[in-house]
């Protein structure tokens, strides 16, 4: 309840420690899922992944598919595209059309971003090799 109050007041830095304690004591995974969402909002991506995975493992979450979407987004931010797509595909199996549509959009976005990142890396490598050849010439 206290964490919800802080969260609603946009006092996320105060909500997180309260939720961390509540998640440890809770018999349900939902508190970890909420904590993972807040971590993601705060760009604490690795913490987000750990919290959401802990919540899913613990079970008793409101929407497993919604948690998988957020977990996919966290992996996407880390450029773990394969794991992100895996989570999005799992979420896309949900009966809720809204979640399914969102998950499928994320899959396409992750696929495109993965190609873009690989192409940038190839381009960067090519430029570095070209500069090295010029220096050695």
Predicted regions and their residues:
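Terminal, low-structured helical/coil segments at or just beyond the last alpha-helical repeat
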Residues: 85-137
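Residues that mark the junctions of alpha-helical repeat units in TPR/alpha-solenoid scaffolds
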Residues: 28, 64, 100-102
């Amino acid at each position: 309840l206290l964490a919800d109050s802080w969260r609603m007041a946009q006092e996320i830095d105060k909500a997180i420690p309260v939720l961390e304690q509540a998640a440890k004591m809770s018999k349900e995974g939902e508190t970890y899922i909420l904590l993972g969402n807040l971590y993601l909002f705060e760009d604490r991506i690795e913490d987000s992944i750990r919290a959401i995975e802990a919540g899913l493992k613990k079970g008793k979450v409101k929407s497993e598919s919604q948690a998988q979407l957020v977990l996919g987004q966290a992996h996407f931010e880390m450029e773990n595209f394969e794991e992100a797509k895996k989570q999005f595909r799992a979420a896309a199996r949900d009966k809720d059309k809204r979640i399914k549509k969102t998950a499928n959009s994320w899959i396409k976005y992750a696929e495109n971003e993965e190609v873009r990142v690989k192409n940038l890396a190839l381009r960067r490598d090519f430029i570095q090799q070209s500069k090295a050849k010029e220096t050695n010439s």
